[in-house]
């Protein structure tokens, strides 16, 4: 009996220990769970801060871009928004008024009914000028005319064309029209003429094709590089380019001179014939 009692007591003790372990283990997990989740919970806050900073940076970049565009705007009326405390001022006649506080500048603008325009912001202090509305309008028109007179030219493109020495006249006319379009767009045109198969043709005959093409564009195009042998003498190559403005002007003057000489010569011949008839 005693042995049976001890056995039951031992089993009951083991069950109690297991129950306590489960109970305390569950309690420990409940306590430690929030501590484990706290770094995860703080993550959104960190993400939010980073996002806010990134958004602010992008906004600053956009503002800087807007400021740069405003600074690049040609000849604009500043108005009363003078960023510098002291500026170097010129009046509407171009007279140097020296350094002046912006409050005095605004007062002068009101007294004379003038506008304020930036002249040079890279100096210290920055240079500004008082101008009338009409002066600003005239200056803008002058700047636009200067831009039209000196347009910004992009990089020169090179077009390439390969012809055969035995090309037909119809095909040559078609290719010549294409070359003329490229020349009008100020492109360089590289032309290569290869010797046709089973055709005995001299370099002079091939070079004559280049001159035939060039003669269709008098006063418009000329050789950038003259015809020369390439590919071991199997082909000739040249580069055509458009006339420069000075070349166009010189060509027109030459043509006008020749026309005047021709008219004078014809007029002189008419006089001689009239004298003979008399």
Swiss-Prot record:
Q: Which GO terms describe its cellular component?
A: mitochondrion
- Transit peptide, UniProt annotation: 1-31
What is stated as this protein's family in its record?
Belongs to the IF-3 family.
Instruction: Give me the segments passing through the membrane.
Output: none
Name the Gene Ontology biological process terms: mitochondrial translational initiation; ribosome disassembly
Q: Which InterPro entries does this chain map to?
A: T_IF-3_C_sf, T_IF-3_N_sf, Translation_initiation_fac_3, Translation_initiation_fac_3_N
Protein name in UniProt: Translation initiation factor IF-3, mitochondrial
What's this protein's function? IF-3 binds to the 28S ribosomal subunit and shifts the equilibrium between 55S ribosomes and their 39S and 28S subunits in favor of the free subunits, thus enhancing the availability of 28S subunits on which protein synthesis initiation begins.
Identify the stretch(es) annotated as Disordered: 249-278
**Which organism encodes this protein?**
Homo sapiens (Human)
Identify a single GO molecular function assigned to this protein: ribosome binding
Localization in the cell = Mitochondrion
């Amino acid at each position: 009996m005693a042995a049976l009692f001890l056995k039951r007591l031992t089993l009951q003790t083991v069950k109690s220990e297991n129950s306590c372990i489960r109970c305390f283990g569950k309690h420990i997990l409940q306590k430690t769970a929030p501590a484990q989740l706290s770094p995860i919970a703080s993550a959104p806050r960190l993400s939010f801060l980073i996002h806010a900073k990134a958004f602010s940076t992008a906004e600053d970049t956009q503002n800087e871009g807007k400021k740069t565009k405003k600074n690049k705007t040609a000849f604009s009326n500043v108005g009363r928004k003078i960023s510098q405390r002291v500026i170097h001022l010129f009046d509407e006649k171009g007279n140097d008024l020296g350094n002046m506080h912006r409050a005095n500048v605004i007062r002068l603008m009101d007294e004379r009914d003038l506008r304020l325009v930036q002249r040079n912001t890279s100096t210290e202090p920055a240079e500004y000028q008082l101008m009338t509305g009409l002066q600003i309008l005239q200056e803008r028109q002058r700047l636009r005319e200067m831009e039209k007179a000196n347009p910004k030219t992009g990089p020169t493109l090179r077009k390439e064309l390969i012809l055969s020495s035995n090309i037909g006249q119809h095909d040559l006319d078609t290719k010549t029209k294409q070359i003329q379009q490229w020349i009008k767009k100020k492109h360089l045109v590289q032309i290569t003429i290869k010797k046709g198969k089973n055709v005995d043709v001299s370099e002079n005959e091939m070079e004559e094709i280049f001159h035939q093409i060039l003669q269709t564009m008098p006063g418009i195009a000329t050789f950038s590089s003259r015809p020369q042998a390439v590919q071991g003498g199997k082909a000739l190559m040249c580069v055509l380019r458009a006339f420069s403005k000075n070349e166009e002007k010189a060509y027109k003057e030459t043509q006008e001179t020749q026309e005047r000489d021709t008219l004078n010569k014809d007029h002189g011949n008419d006089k001689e014939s009239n004298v003979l008839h008399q």
